[in-house]
């Protein structure tokens, strides 16, 4: 009897030990699985919302695989007219960061004010915005065209500055540095990568700026006509002069007086091309060009980008080629 009890005790002990080992193995497996999930979660890219394409471009180049960047302005849409759905506002509030230009899009300004994520990057502090009046052409007339109610609203939104800084790659370089520093602060574990990529992007933008300046240094003509005056920063950088059919806001309609001034300038200066834009109706420009016996071509302000095969730098190079052809550059 004692032997039987002794054997049973050993049997119970063995079963108990086996169970303990099994539980330990399960616990270890669960712990490993939990650690793997935690590691995978920590490796997930940071969600970043950019207000429009040029800022999306910079942020993606700087963040690389560490970020998942989405533009609040849909591809092919006019950013001046942006309205945000409740879903987009919610996505913004849940993002790791937002990159925007304060004063350019009132819907974004309001969303950031009311639903800001932890990291807010306002590039207006680094890109040296210029007073709008400095980028008005010499042809601006008193009535500045017949503006729609919507155009007046946009004019109020933009305030007294020209928002189109991204058409000067040197200013894009400054924005790259700011974005890199902000992302590094938001994600310290990858700070070195952000700063390295920002420095590389800055160098690329500075090289592009030099290419624009050198490529337009020897041109027969120095004036170019555009649909609206979005190219002031590019003109400043290259020493050229833009003459816009309408002002900074694309919704303003050129007055008869403005069109006459453009016509007179084209004849007097030997201008051969009126530039249109992808996102604006070319009707007025094409009609005027036909009346004057000259051509039209596209000069892209890169406010939005629907063609995934071309990025900011590629479009800027196309803009340079278009200018060189229109201005008879060497």
Where are these regions (language model features)?
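Extracytoplasmic metal-acquisition and chelation regions
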Residues: 2-17, 22-330
């Amino acid at each position: 009897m004692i032997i039987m009890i002794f054997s049973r005790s050993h049997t119970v002990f063995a079963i108990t030990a086996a169970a303990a080992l099994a539980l330990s193995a399960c616990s270890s497996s669960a712990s490993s699985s939990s650690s793997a999930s935690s590691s995978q979660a920590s490796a997930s890219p940071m969600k970043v919302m950019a207000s429009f394409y040029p800022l999306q471009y910079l942020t993606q180049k700087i963040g690389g695989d560490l970020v998942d960047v989405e533009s609040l302005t849909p591809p092919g849409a006019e950013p001046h007219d942006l309205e945000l759905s409740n879903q987009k506002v919610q996505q913004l509030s849940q993002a790791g960061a937002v990159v925007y230009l304060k004063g350019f899009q009132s819907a974004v300004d309001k969303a950031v004010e009311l639903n800001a994520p932890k990291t807010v990057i306002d590039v207006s502090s680094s890109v040296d915005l210029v007073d709008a009046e400095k980028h008005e052409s010499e042809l601006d007339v008193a009535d500045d065209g017949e503006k729609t109610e919507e155009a007046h609203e946009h004019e109020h939104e933009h305030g007294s500055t020209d928002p189109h800084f991204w058409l000067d790659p040197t200013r894009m370089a400054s924005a790259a540095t700011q974005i890199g520093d902000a992302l590094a602060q938001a994600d310290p574990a990858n700070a070195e990568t952000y700063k390295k990529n920002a420095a590389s992007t800055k160098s690329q933008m500075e090289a592009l700026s030099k290419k624009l300046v050198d490529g337009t240094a020897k041109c027969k003509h120095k004036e170019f006509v555009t649909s609206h005056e979005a190219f002031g920063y590019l003109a400043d950088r290259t020493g050229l002069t833009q003459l816009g059919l309408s002002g900074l806001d694309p919704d303003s309609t050129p007055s008869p007086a403005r069109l006459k001034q453009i016509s007179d300038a084209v004849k007097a200066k030997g201008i051969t091309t009126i530039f249109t834009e992808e996102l604006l109706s070319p009707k007025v420009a094409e009609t005027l060009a036909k009346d004057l016996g000259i051509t039209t071509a596209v000069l892209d302000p890169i406010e939005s980008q629907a063609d995934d095969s071309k990025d900011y730098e590629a479009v800027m190079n196309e803009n340079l080629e278009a200018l060189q052809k229109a201005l008879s550059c060497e």
